[in-house]
Amino acid sequence: MESAKSAAALVEPCQTNSARRLTEDDSLRVSVLSEALPYIQRFSGRRIVIKYGGAAMAHANLQEAVFRDLALLVSVGVEPVVVHGGGPEINQWLERLEIPAKFRDGLRVTDADTMDVVEMVLVGRVNKQIVNGLNQLGAKAVGLSGSDGSLVEARPWGDGSHGLVGDVARVNTDVLEPILAKGYVPVISSVAATVEGCSHNINADTVAGEIAAALEAEKLILLTDTPGILLDRDDPSSLVHQLRLSEARQLIAEGVVAGGMTPKTECCIRALAQGVGAAHIIDGRVPHALLLEVFTDAGIGTMVVGRS
C-alpha cells in the first residue's frame, strides 16, 4: 500500500508539470496566432512576389521551410508569386561540364555555352524541384520561365560585354492573371528571350521586382544570405528594420549600402517607385523567415516603404 502511494506521489507531480507545460505551450500558440490574425486579414487576397534563392535554396531543411511557408500563405488567401535563381547549381553543372564560370561586376558573364547550362538548370531542374515541393504540400504550383508566353521580354544588359546577360524590357501580366485567378502559384525562372527570340540570363532580383511592379503587388520579398540592410556590414546588430524610399537612396549614395546589397536595394527602390506597397530584404538562412516577416509585428529583416 505504501509503495502504491509512493508511486502515485511520483506520478502526480509529473502530470501536474506536464499540464503546466502544455498550458504554457498553448498560450504561446494563441499569442502567435493572435499576432498573425490582423496580418492574415490584411493580406488575404493580396499578391506577394517572393524572390527565392541563396542559402534558402541550397539546404534541404530551409527548402522545406520555404515550401511550407508558401503553402501556408496560399491557405490563408495570399496570392504568392515565386521568382527564383539557382546560381550554386549552375556553378556545379558548369564545373561538371568543364565550362569556366566567369563573373564581372557581380554578374555572370554568359556566353552561348553557359547560357545553355543556365537554361537547362533553371528551367529544367530548379524550377521543377520547386513546383514539385509545393505541389506535395497542397499548394498548386505551375512552373514557368520568363520566355513562356513572352511573360518577360528581355533586352541586352549594358554594353553587351557580359554576353547573354539581360534586363527586363517588359512584363506581360496577361500570362499570370488567369493562373492566379485559378488559385495556382506561378513559379518563374529568371530566363527570358528578346523580341528576336534570343535567350538571356536575367538577375532574379530584377525579374521579381519588375513582376511585382507590373502586378501592383502588395509586397516584394527578397530572400538573401544577409539579415537585411546593415549600417555596419560586419555587425548584424546594426540591422535597419524599416527605411523610407528616400533613406534607402541616401544609404546607397553614402556607400553604406555597397557590394552585393546595392542591386538588391536598387531593385526594391524601383519596385516601390512603380507602386509596390513595400519591399523586404530578409535572411533566407532563418527557417520560416517568410512567415516571420509577413505575419509578426517585429519582422525579421529590412522593410523599405515608399512613404513614412
Curated annotation (Swiss-Prot):
GO cellular-component term (any): cytoplasm
Pfam family, one: AA_kinase
GO molecular function: acetylglutamate kinase activity; ATP binding
Transferase as UniProt keyword: yes
Pathway in which the depicted protein is active: Amino-acid biosynthesis; L-arginine biosynthesis; N(2)-acetyl-L-ornithine from L-glutamate: step 2/4
UniProt-listed Enzyme Commission number(s): 2.7.2.8
UniProt keywords, alphabetically: Amino-acid biosynthesis, Arginine biosynthesis, ATP-binding, Cytoplasm, Kinase, Nucleotide-binding, Transferase
InterPro entries linked to this entry: AceGlu_kinase-like_sf (IPR036393), AcgluKinase_fam (IPR004662), ArgB (IPR037528), Asp/Glu/Uridylate_kinase (IPR001048), Glu/AcGlu_kinase (IPR001057), NAGK-C (IPR041727)
HAMAP family assigned to the protein according to its UniProt record, in alphabetical order: ArgB (MF_00082)
Protein name (record): Acetylglutamate kinase
